[in-house]
Amino acid sequence: XISSSTPPYDLNRFK
């Protein structure tokens, strides 16, 4: 997300 700073952390939110 959008709340996350950078991938792959952003991808983990979709999980």
Curated annotation (Swiss-Prot):
Expression across tissues: Starchy endosperm.
Domain of life: Eukaryota
Protein name according to UniProt: Unknown endosperm protein E-15/E-16/E-17
Organism: Hordeum vulgare (Barley)
